[in-house]
Regions:
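Flavin-dependent oxidoreductase catalytic cores
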Residues: 1-143, 147-163, 171-173
Length: 175
C-alpha cells in the first residue's frame, strides 16, 4: 500500500425504497457483517462495516468475530447522540433506538426537507432553542408506545400537557 487508501468502507443496501444503498428496517442488525468479514480477509487495510447497527452488542460481536475493524453508527447516533455515553455507563436500555425508518436520508435527499429523524425530533434542530411551555396545557392521549409515541408523550409532558400513553403490548418500545 502507498497510503492513498486508509480503510475500506463496506456497505450493502437493499432494493426497497429510493435510497437503495442504506439498509432499512426490514433487515436485521448486522445482516451483511458476514459478507464484510469475507471481504476483510482479502486486505490488510482496516475495514469499516456500515449497515444497520442499533445495539452495542451487535457492534462488539461484529468486531469480535473479525468481520470488521470498525463499525459505523451514524443512524444510531442521530437517533440518540448519547448512544456511546449511555452504553459505556452500562445503561443501554436508556438509548433511544434507531428503527431504520431512514427519514434522516429520505427527508433531506429525496424530499428537499430539513434534516430529521423519525425517533429523535431534535435531530437537525440542535442549534434552535428548546420548545417552551405550552400557553394552554391540554389533556393528551398518545396511542402507541413505540419510540415515536414515547417521544411525543415526553415532549408534550415537558411542555406542561397532561399526557396518557397507551400501548397494546405489555412493554413500551415498539420493535
Amino acid at each position: 500500500t502507498d497510503g492513498t487508501i486508509d480503510f475500506f468502507n463496506l456497505d450493502v443496501g437493499g432494493n426497497w425504497g429510493p435510497v437503495s444503498y442504506i439498509q432499512h428496517g426490514m433487515y436485521p442488525e448486522g445482516h451483511w457483517a458476514q459478507m464484510c468479514g469475507e471481504a476483510k480477509q482479502a486486505t490488510t487495510l482496516p475495514v469499516l462495516y456500515v449497515g444497520r447497527v442499533v445495539h452495542a452488542e451487535t457492534a462488539e460481536r461484529i468486531i469480535a468475530d473479525d468481520q470488521a475493524d470498525m463499525v459505523g453508527l451514524v443512524r444510531a447516533l442521530i437517533a440518540d447522540p448519547r448512544w456511546l455515553t449511555l452504553n459505556l455507563a452500562g445503561e443501554p436500555e436508556r438509548v433511544r433506538p434507531c428503527v431504520a425508518l431512514n427519514d434522516c436520508i429520505h427527508r433531506y435527499t429525496l424530499e428537499g426537507l430539513g434534516f430529521g429523524c423519525g425517533t429523535n425530533p431534535r435531530a437537525g434542530r440542535e442549534s434552535k432553542p428548546p420548545i417552551g411551555t405550552a400557553s394552554q396545557p391540554v389533556r393528551l392521549l398518545v396511542v402507541g408506545g413505540g419510540p415515536a409515541g414515547m417521544e411525543l408523550a415526553a415532549t408534550a409532558a415537558e411542555r406542561g400537557h397532561e399526557v396518557e400513553l397507551w400501548e397494546a403490548k405489555p412493554e413500551f418500545g415498539g420493535r
